[in-house]
């Protein structure tokens, strides 16, 4: 079952990306390194509620 999630920057807390994940294979919170246009650098983005 795929669910839609939002990824937020860990530096500035801006919600920059929307994506989906498979809850069965990834039950814990997802963290990806993505570009933040507010910080103007690549930072870790963590799944939010």
Swiss-Prot record:
GO terms for molecular function: structural constituent of ribosome. Pfam families: Ribosomal_L33. Gene3D superfamilies: Ribosomal protein L33. GO terms for cellular component: cytoplasm; ribonucleoprotein complex; ribosome. GO terms for biological process: translation. NCBIfam families: PRK00504.1, PRK00595.1, rpmG_bact. Belongs to the bacterial ribosomal protein bL33 family. This is Large ribosomal subunit protein bL33. It comes from Alkaliphilus oremlandii (strain OhILAs).
